[in-house]
Amino acid sequence: MGKPNGLKTARKLRNHRRVQRWNDKLYKKAHFGTALKANPFGGASHASGIVVSRLGIEAKQPNSAIRKCVRVQLKKNGKKITAFVPNDGCLNYIQENDKVLVAGLGRSGHSVGDIPGVRFKVVKVSSVSLIAIYRGIKDKPNV
């Protein structure tokens, strides 16, 4: 038995489609609003916070490395997140209690590559781009 067809079936088709939409995972995620509540950024692209601690996270198999990360407490809601510090030796430019700007890393809501549970990356330290400090273009201000 297929879809009803013919005259006067529009209401039945429309109602059936409305009910079946809720079986679509992406539709549910967009319309329940729980994904926005669970997101530490609250729908924003970036968030600023204070560095709580510096840590190294072991890469997943088959890689063996210690990925340098920082724990950041966000200013907007007080949530603590783990953020990846890109480039070789950039962790040396970040101290505890520094202000950092954090952005998403890769796929929305998922960790990337071999770093388990890390969904964010550090973009700025003390309002200066981390890449600029790394390349020697700018110096980190001593505040």
Curated annotation (Swiss-Prot):
Q: Name one GO biological process term.
A: translation
What SUPFAM superfamilies does the database record attribute to this sequence?
A: Nucleic acid-binding proteins (SSF50249)
Disulfide links within the chain: none
Q: Which UniProt keywords apply?
A: Hydroxylation, Ribonucleoprotein, Ribosomal protein
What Gene Ontology terms describe where this protein resides (cellular component)? cytosolic small ribosomal subunit; ribosome
Hydroxyproline PTM positions? 62
Recorded GO molecular functions are: structural constituent of ribosome
Q: Which InterPro entries match?
A: NA-bd_OB-fold, Ribosomal_uS12, Ribosomal_uS12_euk/arc
Q: Which PROSITE patterns match?
A: RIBOSOMAL_S12
Q: Which Pfam families match?
A: Ribosom_S12_S23
- UniProt keyword annotation of Isomerase present: no
| Family per similarity comment | Belongs to the universal ribosomal protein uS12 family.
Protein name (Swiss-Prot/TrEMBL): Small ribosomal subunit protein uS12
Q: Which organism is it from?
A: Dictyostelium discoideum
Q: What is the lineage of its organism?
A: Eukaryota, Amoebozoa, Evosea, Eumycetozoa, Dictyostelia
